[in-house]
Structures are given as C-alpha cells and as structure tokens.
C-alpha cells in the first residue's frame, strides 16, 4: 500500500506522536508512506526535528495552517487534490480537525481509493462558544460524508459525534492511541534529578503534565493543591509543562500560599518525561478538554494512580476506584480528598497503580495501534474492490 498521513503541524504533541508512530508502523510492515504537514513551529518544539531516520518521506507545505483561513484553505485543498492524484496513493489518512476537513475533501476530489480520518480531540464541546461549535459541527458533517472510515482514540468521541449527527455508526472504529510504553514501564526515580529540582528526599509528590494554558486544568489544580498542602505538609507539586500562562499561575500559587511547595519544571522533552513522572506518587489531570489524555496512560504505565475529571475519553483509562479516581469537574474538595486518600494510603496507592499499569500495557502499545490500522486499511480496500 501507498499511504499519505496528513496533519497540519508536527509539533511535539499527542496527535503528532500518534501520526509519527502510525507512519513508522507502515514502513516496518513493508508499505510506502509519506507524512505531509504544514510548518511545524510552536513553543512545544518540532517533532520533525526529533525524528532520526524515520524511514519514510516527510514533506512540509506553508499552505497547511492550523487556523481557519478561507483563501489559504481553498488553495490548500486544490493543491493537495492535485498532489494526491499525481502520486496515486491508496490511502490518505488525516489527523485532527483542520487537516481532517482539508484532507478529506481533497482526497475525495483526487479519487483516492480509501479516505480515512482520526479524531484525536473534538474542536467543539460544552466549553466552546455556540458559534464555534456550529461552525465545526457543520464542517465535520461535511467532511464525514467525504470519507470511508473515522477512527477515534476514545469511544466517548464517537458517541459525541453521533449525537451531533456527524457520520454514520458504521463509519466509526475506536483505535486507542498507541505509545512507546517501554521507557515508562521501565522508569525508576532518579535521585540526582530529584535533587536538581529541589524536592526533599522525604517528600511525597503530586504531578501535573500539561501546557500552562487555560482549560488545561490549572485553575482547578492550584486551589486543590492548596487544600492538599494543608493536609499533607510534606507534599510537593511538580508541574511539567510551560506556556503563556506561567506567570499568572506562579502568581496564583503565591496568593494561595503554596509557592514554595510548587516546582515549575518548565517544558520537559518527550525523551525525559518518564524520568520526571517517576518522581511522583500520584498524577492529577484536570483538563476540561482532552480526547484521551496521554499523560494518564503514561502515568499509569509507571504505576502512578491518576485523579481526573470524567470528561471525553478519560474514563476509558482512569477507571474510578481501580486505576485512580474520577471527581466532578470543578469540585475542589472532592479532588483534594481523592489526592489525600492516595497519598495517605500507600497500599491502596500501589494497588491502583498496578491495576492501571496492567490496563495500559495491554491497550496502548504503539505496535498494536499500527497493526490494527493496517489491517483495517486492507479490509476496507478489499471491501471497496468488491463493490
């Protein structure tokens, strides 16, 4: 097979890592693959720069931009349709909302035999404006009518799409987002890193991994941390991430009286995130919008329980009372009590962590994801040939 994976930008992020591993799996299975993206610039850093001999072709075009730009997007559709037609791909696989809309339209215009799309997170939801929701829902309905298969990294988003009348039930297939789990499964606490971050040896650690940006949950995390700090004087809070709201969050911790208990580690490279998570006892994730939080999978791979909100795909990996606890969004008291319970009961903490580790080891290996996609491509192409 000859497959084109298309995403608007290859910054360091979950959807991008998924795309990279999907392409890598194709090449390792003996197929031909091109990864097509727009300019991969951002505070997060470029994933393309981290790729070492990926084994597949990579192409960037300035026409592919993340923001809605009608004139540029129209040019992108026609350019991409012409390119796909010339290259005679068997499959175009688009990722995320913007590339999904542009790529599916272009793929159908070009007559690509199989047009598929992966939902990593929805561009509409209860925390977005009515106008934005209507715009994206209509665009997603239009694009869904121009593709053969829609993959989702969580069942929750399939349900949300069908409720919004996007696509048909038979179009959807859940394929959990595979990851390179080995470094998380094997991670051990590093005393030198702990010392470098200024975390005393006898302190327990609550971790958070997310960009310092609204809706990533820090508006809830820090007030919750203040409650936990009062109950557990030896606890520190390790923040793994950076972003435009850092100064505001640092000020918030000062106002809450916990600035000396919070370590802002800054942007941690994907190659080292396992080392940092290994220093924690529990991970909190209070994002209001997340497809399926990769940080929850990564934390559980290290047997660290997770406390999170039951939004989007989170309950599919954070099983309440089994691999962590789910608490009502915005309920600081419930979140604090869940964290305190995990911190104060080491036997329960170990049990939650080990259950989660077993869960993600089975569901989230990247090779399992890749093999599932390839088998589905082949089955869909075979079914289309019979028609």
For each feature predicted by the language model, list its residue ranges.
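N-terminal strand-loop element at the rim of the active site
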Residues: 5-72
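Short hydrophobic beta-strand element within catalytic cores of glycosyltransferases
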Residues: 305-308, 318
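A conserved mid-protein helix/loop that constitutes part of the nucleotide-sugar donor-binding site
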Residues: 16-24, 204, 208-230, 244-251, ...
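Aromatic "clamp/platform" in nucleotide-sugar-dependent glycosyltransferases that forms part
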Residues: 288
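A short, well-ordered alpha-helix in the C-terminal region of glycosyltransferases
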Residues: 107, 334, 341, 348-363, ...
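A short, active-site helix/loop in glycosyltransferases that binds the activated sugar's phosphate group
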Residues: 146-174, 179-183
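Short alpha-helical donor nucleotide-sugar binding micro-motif in glycosyltransferases
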Residues: 84, 267-268, 275-280
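Conserved acidic donor-binding segment of nucleotide-sugar-dependent glycosyltransferases
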Residues: 320-321, 325-332, 341-346
């Amino acid at each position: 097979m000859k497959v084109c994976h298309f995403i608007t930008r290859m910054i360091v992020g979950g959807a991008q890592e998924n795309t990279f591993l999907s392409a890598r799996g194709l090449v390792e299975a003996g197929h031909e693959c091109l990864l097509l993206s727009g300019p991969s610039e951002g505070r997060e850093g470029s994933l393309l720069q981290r790729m070492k001999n990926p084994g597949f072709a990579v192409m960037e075009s300035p026409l592919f931009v993340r923001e809605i730009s009608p004139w540029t997007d129209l040019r992108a559709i026609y350019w991409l349709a012409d390119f796909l037609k010339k290259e005679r791909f068997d499959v175009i696989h688009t990722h995320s909302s913007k590339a999904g809309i542009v790529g599916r339209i272009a793929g159908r215009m070009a007559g690509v035999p199989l047009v598929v799309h992966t939902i990593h997170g929805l561009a509409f939801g209860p925390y977005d404006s009515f106008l934005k929701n209507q715009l994206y829902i209509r665009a997603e309905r239009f694009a869904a009518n121009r593709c053969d298969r829609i993959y989702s990294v969580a069942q929750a988003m399939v349900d949300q799409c069908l409720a919004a009348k996007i696509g048909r039930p038979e179009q959807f297939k859940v394929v959990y987002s595979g990851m390179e789990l080995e470094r998380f499964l094997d991670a051990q606490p590093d005393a030198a890193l702990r010392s470098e971050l200024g975390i005393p040896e006898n302190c327990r650690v609550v971790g958070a991994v997310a960009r310092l940006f609204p809706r990533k949950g820090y508006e809830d995390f820090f007030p919750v941390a203040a409650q936990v700090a009062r109950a557990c004087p030896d606890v520190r809070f390790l923040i793994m991430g950076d972003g435009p709201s850092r100064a505001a969050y640092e000020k918030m911790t000062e106002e809450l009286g916990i600035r000396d208990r919070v370590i802002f580690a800054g942007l941690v490279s994907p190659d080292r995130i396992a080392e940092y998570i290994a220093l924690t006892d529990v991970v909190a994730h209070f994002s209001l919008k997340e497809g399926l939080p990769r940080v929850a999978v990564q934390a559980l791979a290290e047997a660290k329980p997770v406390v999170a909100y039951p939004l989007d795909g989170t309950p599919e990996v954070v099983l309440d009372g089994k691999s962590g606890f789910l608490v009502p969004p915005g309920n600081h008291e419930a979140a604090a009590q869940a964290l305190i319970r995990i911190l104060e009961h080491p036997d329960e903490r170990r049990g939650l962590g080990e259950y989660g580790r077993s869960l993600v080891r089975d569901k989230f290996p990247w090779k399992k994801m890749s093999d599932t996609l390839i088998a589905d491509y082949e089955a869909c192409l075979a079914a289309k040939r019979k028609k």
